């Protein structure tokens, strides 16, 4: 089975200007993310999909495989799908380009279910357990929460605190969604061909398009948190953590 990690990398970003090219201990942020992805044991190939000649050149010089995609794409999954048409494969992993501290084993958690006996999943993603008393996280609309069924499939994703806590119960589980996905190739192609759904537009969460159209998203629990980079403060924190983990 051919598993391809695709890292979407736009030059423009809303909150931190040109963050993909921000320096992280001597190399651009996107290069550091690509380096971590290359350590995956279950992926056969790592490709960066970009709309920027500058990012393309930086990654090419670093030895990465890079493909150019349209600058008119509206979301990262569209960029993944366009890259998938160019490179081919059976399973495609969508790894965010601003996660240079991603543990390769965490990536492999999302890939592993595709190697299990039985039908392959439509899509997999990761969730991080939260404690019921972490209300500042659960109530934060910038943190996406997930509710799962008994088999680990997503019932719903929301920016609201779900499940709603009418009573405090010891077995109530809260999960924060981690935006790493692995798609079966045919599901990825079908996903981008579907119009944005009502719930997707309401919550501004594209994964709801899959659920509304009857696809299942298998959620795998991880206890490894991965910080992204959206602000200058987060970039400084990632630099500090990078030095701790890898040295300066």
Curated annotation (Swiss-Prot):
Gene Ontology cellular-component annotations: cytosol
Primary site of residence: cytoplasm
Record Gene3D superfamilies: Spore Coat Polysaccharide Biosynthesis Protein SpsA, Chain A
Annotated keywords: Cytoplasm, Lipopolysaccharide biosynthesis, Nucleotidyltransferase, Transferase
GO BP field: CMP-keto-3-deoxy-D-manno-octulosonic acid biosynthetic process; lipopolysaccharide biosynthetic process
TM region positions: none
Gene Ontology MF annotations: 3-deoxy-manno-octulosonate cytidylyltransferase activity
Pfam families: CTP_transf_3 (PF02348)
Catalysed reactions listed for this entry: 3-deoxy-alpha-D-manno-oct-2-ulosonate + CTP = CMP-3-deoxy-beta-D-manno-octulosonate + diphosphate
Pathway: Nucleotide-sugar biosynthesis; CMP-3-deoxy-D-manno-octulosonate biosynthesis; CMP-3-deoxy-D-manno-octulosonate from 3-deoxy-D-manno-octulosonate and CTP: step 1/1; Bacterial outer membrane biogenesis; lipopolysaccharide biosynthesis
PANTHER family, alphabetized: 3-DEOXY-MANNO-OCTULOSONATE CYTIDYLYLTRANSFERASE, 3-DEOXY-MANNO-OCTULOSONATE CYTIDYLYLTRANSFERASE, MITOCHONDRIAL
Family of this protein: Belongs to the KdsB family.
UniProt function note: Activates KDO (a required 8-carbon sugar) for incorporation into bacterial lipopolysaccharide in Gram-negative bacteria.
Name assigned to this protein: 3-deoxy-manno-octulosonate cytidylyltransferase
């Amino acid at each position: 089975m051919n598993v391809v990690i695709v890292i979407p990398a736009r030059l423009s970003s809303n909150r931190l200007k040109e963050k993909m090219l921000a320096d992280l201990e001597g190399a651009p942020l996107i290069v550091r993310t690509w380096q971590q992805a290359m350590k995956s044991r279950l992926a056969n190939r790592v490709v960066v999909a970009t709309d920027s000649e500058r990012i393309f050149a930086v990654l090419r010089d670093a030895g990465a495989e890079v493909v150019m995609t349209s600058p008119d794409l509206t979301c990262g999954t569209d960029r993944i799908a366009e890259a998938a048409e160019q490179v081919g494969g059976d399973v495609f992993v969508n790894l965010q380009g601003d996660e240079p501290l991603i543990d390769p084993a965490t990536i492999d958690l999302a890939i592993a279910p595709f190697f299990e006996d039985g039908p392959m999943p439509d899509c997999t993603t990761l969730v991080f357990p939260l404690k019921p008393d972490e209300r500042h996280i659960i109530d934060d609309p910038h943190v996406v929460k997930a509710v799962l069924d008994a088999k680990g499939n997503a019932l719903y994703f929301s920016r609201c605190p779900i499940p709603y806590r009418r009573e405090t119960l010891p077995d109530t589980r809260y999960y924060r969604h981690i935006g790493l996905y692995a798609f079966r190739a045919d599901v990825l192609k079908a996903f981008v061909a579907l119009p944005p759904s009502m719930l997707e537009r309401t919550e501004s969460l594209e994964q709801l398009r899959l659920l509304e159209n009857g696809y299942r998203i298998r959620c795998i629990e991880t206890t490894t948190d991965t910080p992204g980079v959206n602000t200058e403060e987060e970039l400084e924190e990632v630099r500090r953590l990078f030095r701790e983990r890898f040295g300066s």
